[in-house]
Design a protein with these regions (language model features):
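Hydrophobic/aromatic beta-strand patches that form the interior of the parallel beta-sheet core
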Residues: 30-32, 61, 118-122, 158-160, ...
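Electrostatically charged, flexible surface regions
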Residues: 134-241
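Hydrophobic/aromatic ligand-binding patch that stacks against planar heteroaromatic rings
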Residues: 108-112
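Short, Asp-centered acidic motifs that coordinate Mg2+ and/or phosphate
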Residues: 85
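A cross-family phosphate/adenosyl-ligand binding-site feature
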Residues: 3, 17-77, 81-82
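Glycine/threonine-rich flexible loop motifs
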Residues: 94-103
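Glycine-rich phosphate/pyrophosphate-binding loops
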Residues: 113-134
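Short, glycine-rich nucleotide/cofactor-binding loops
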Residues: 5-12, 99-100
Length: 241
């Protein structure tokens, strides 16, 4: 299978390099990843600037742009072969609940929504690289299981979160997104006209069946996410009112 790998932490980050090593054992790997960290960059496209692309080795591109830029340019211009699937990660840090709105990891995967297989975003619930090899092996195992599952609609993105563990985790559950509370307020830097964005809110909707609950119980969470943001229930009520 031909896989395009991307991320938001940058090409030289430990997470994507671990995933390259693991998935290249069985698959043909192409890489298009940002030059710099673009965490929380969401689905931004750089439409107001020229974007520099460096071909650092065969089928590996380092792009001075956003995660979405990377996958968009790779699929529409750089890579002539037919790519089967986009996999984004391994992100160092969780993408649970509302995090997916801001996530550059999820956004990179989302750019692969028109391919044969559902795009996949993978995150490790820690910024510590100690257990990254276990996470990469778990990612490879889950990837193979997903590809074998013919019931997954290719118009769905799969958001995977892997608990941090000293052991290789293979147990996984399909979950729904939880929900975070109000984020920590932005903070002004003393005596300067600069501000820092506050931390994400604590989980509020974290009951059984959510990604929060599942990962807290040391089980890998796989959340199917649809691209259609329409609230169909409200739409139906409005049309019938």
């Amino acid at each position: 299978m031909k896989i395009l790998l991307s991320n938001d932490d940058g090409y030289y980050s430990d997470g994507i390099q671990a995933l390259i090593r693991e998935l290249s054992i069985k698959h043909e790997i192409y890489v298009a990843a940002p030059l710099e960290n673009n965490s929380a960059g969401s689905s931004a496209l750089s439409t107001r600037k020229d974007i520099k692309v460096d071909n650092v080795e065969k089928n590996h591109y380092v792009i001075d742009g956003t995660p979405a830029d990377c996958v968009h340019i790779a699929l529409t211009c750089l890579i002539k072969e037919k790519i089967d699937i986009v996999v984004s990660g391994i992100n160092m840090g969780a993408n649970l609940g509302d995090d997916v709105i801001y996530s550059g990891t999820v956004a990179a995967a989302l750019e692969g929504r028109h391919l044969e297989f559902s795009p996949i975003a993978i995150s490790l619930i820690t910024k510590d690289v100690t257990n990254l090899k276990n996470a990469a092996q778990a990612s490879s195992y889950i990837f193979e299981e997903i590809i074998k599952n013919k019931t997954i609609n290719k118009k769905t993105l799969l958001n995977i979160n892997i608990p941090d563990s000293n052991n290789l985790i293979k147990n996984f559950e399909y979950t729904r997104l939880g929900r975070r509370g109000i984020p920590v307020p932005a903070k002004k830097i003393k005596d300067k006209n600069f501000y820092n964005i506050g931390a994400a809110g604590d989980p509020e909707e974290k009951g059984k069946g959510t990604d929060f609950f599942t990962t807290n119980n040391n089980i890998i969470s796989i959340t199917p996410i649809t691209y259609d943001l329409t609230n169909s229930i409200i739409l139906k009520k409005l049309n019938n009112s």
